[in-house]
Amino acid sequence: FVKSEVIAEMMRSKSSVEWGSEQPVPTGGHSAMSTLLRAARHGKLIVFSAGNYNNYNIPEAQKSLPYAFPDVLNNYLIVTNLSDENQLSVSSTSCGQTASYCVSAPGSDIYSTVGRLESNTGGAVNREAYNKGELSVNPGYGNKSGTSMAAPHVTGVAAVLMQRFPYMSADQISAVIKTTATDLGVAGIDNLFGWGRVNLRDAINGPKMFITQEDIPQEYYVPGSYSEKQFVVNIPGLGNIVEPGTSVERRCTSSECDFDSWSNDISGHGGLTKTGAGTLALLGNNTYRGDTWVKQGVLAINGSVASNVYIENSGTL
């Protein structure tokens, strides 16, 4: 069975596709794992529920795919379930070994869409009936709790941010979600809450950290991950192409594609590289340690930047 796992391939047409089923599958997990790997490598954001196996358990193997393939970690988000008191729900699996790419979200007593498998013939609901095509989903609404309620919350946040930042790639959207999360529990990334509770109010103001390996606690670091030193942002100019030559290539037609501003204070060991013909304004007091490169277009610093700033021929500060 694929139990309550939300696999969200965030399509760049500003819609989301979610699979949140409890239906049996006729084959093993290898084809599903291959599909997840392929989706992540083709620019999709994979949002996975951590599972409902109590706080002291850790996520199952499929959530740990980035340990085998660290190149997809930035396109993966694992989600735990918070109670109304911002505590990890007693039923929720903790972030555990996935903490460096895990966040938390409300998932207790959520009124939402639900679906149940029912037999078309009045028979049993089991694998054999599924294989025969005798089952269908009866949709409806109801109150549910669990990480399968928390994960769609994060999917919704990602969808809003893809509209807010139409020029960003899925891995950059993931970075914004992680770095703007409200810290819970032990300071910083921890094994229960990961980066913390997702915070859309802060996320719409841009990233709060340019992440590198140095920003991840050693006990949660996935070897080979967070290897990029620069957050490369392409403000392309109105009507120009972003992520060209990829499966998510698209024309950027929103006003943010021509001018955008980030007002959060940005920290971290990474740096910023500005590309594209448009303008990006930094409004916060930024302490990130990496270099700032203006390769194309305009970077307006209306707050402050502590790093070294370099300007190439077609760039303007």
Question: Language model features by range: what are they?
Answer:
Residues 1-71, 135-145, 149-151:
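Substrate-binding/access-modulating region of protease and related hydrolase catalytic domains
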Residues 57-61, 171, 194, 265-267, ...:
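Surface-exposed loop/turn positions within long extracellular repeat scaffolds
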Residues 236, 245-247, 251, 296, ...:
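Tight coil/turn sites that cap or link beta-strands
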Residues 40-43, 50-53, 80-83, 95, ...:
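Sec/Tat-exported extracytoplasmic proteins
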Residues 75-78, 163-241, 249-251, 255-256:
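C-terminal subdomain of the subtilisin-like protease fold in secreted/lumenal serine endopeptidases
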Residues 42, 66-159, 163:
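Extracellular S/T/G-rich loop segment that most often corresponds to the catalytic His/Ser-adjacent loop
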